[in-house]
Amino acid sequence: MATHHTLWMGLALLGVLGDLQAAPEAQVSVQPNFQQDKFLGRWFSAGLASNSSWLREKKAALSMCKSVVAPAADGGLNLTSTFLRKNQCETRTMLLQTAGSLGSYSYRSPHWGSTYSVSVVETDYDQYALLYSQGSKGPGEDFRMATLYSRTQTPRAELKEKFTAFCKAQGFTEDTIVFLPQTDKCLTEQ
């Protein structure tokens, strides 16, 4: 279960049980001319959307987490996320391996043994990043998730609107989109 929480709160907190939902209406593109070095550093998970029943069931208990993106030895990214779980801060690291074009990665869930694609759809590097993850836990169990990352704990209203519009364009509904509340724990440098 810790793996589930880590993946959800970190980037693509992937590998949770999925409910089928309408397929995305548009193909997801990757940030043109993605500059991985500018993407490094601290981010806060500000919003999530997913077709997984887990998000709908647990969204009231979720809160913002801090993630630090660092280069990995293989050219990919290490995503280290610190989040609140059972009133304690937990830290997990996941390896995003490069997958084709710049800004495209893959992540293999050690818990489920499934591989997910993770794309940096849009970022200005200084304020926000929109990420989209997709994969399959098994036959007929498609998983999709969008994540809004912010360099600050208080993303601007326009960024939330941009994220909501992006999510709806991917077929997510209002009940599958959540903006994560700040917490006074686990968000500062440790």
Curated annotation (Swiss-Prot):
It comes from the Eukaryota. The active site is at C65. One of its GO terms (molecular function) is prostaglandin-D synthase activity. The keyword Isomerase applies. Keywords: Cytoplasm, Disulfide bond, Endoplasmic reticulum, Fatty acid biosynthesis, Fatty acid metabolism, Glycoprotein, Golgi apparatus, Isomerase, Lipid biosynthesis, Lipid metabolism, Mast cell degranulation, Membrane, Nucleus, Prostaglandin biosynthesis, Prostaglandin metabolism, Secreted, Signal, Transport. CDD domains: lipocalin_L-PGDS. Residues 1-22 form the signal peptide. Glycans are attached at N51, N78. One of its GO terms (biological process) is prostaglandin biosynthetic process. Its EC number is 5.3.99.2. GO terms for cellular component: extracellular region; extracellular space; Golgi apparatus; nuclear membrane; perinuclear region of cytoplasm; rough endoplasmic reticulum. It is found in: Rough endoplasmic reticulum; Nucleus membrane; Golgi apparatus; Cytoplasm, Perinuclear region. SUPFAM superfamilies: Lipocalins. Disulfide bonds join C89-C186. It catalyses: prostaglandin H2 = prostaglandin D2. The keyword Lipid biosynthesis applies. Belongs to the calycin superfamily. Lipocalin family. Forms a beta-barrel structure that accommodates hydrophobic ligands in its interior. Catalyzes the conversion of PGH2 to PGD2, a prostaglandin involved in smooth muscle contraction/relaxation and a potent inhibitor of platelet aggregation. Involved in a variety of CNS functions, such as sedation, NREM sleep and PGE2-induced allodynia, and may have an anti-apoptotic role in oligodendrocytes. Binds small non-substrate lipophilic molecules, including biliverdin, bilirubin, retinal, retinoic acid and thyroid hormone, and may act as a scavenger for harmful hydrophobic molecules and as a secretory retinoid and thyroid hormone transporter. This is Prostaglandin-H2 D-isomerase. It comes from Gorilla gorilla gorilla.
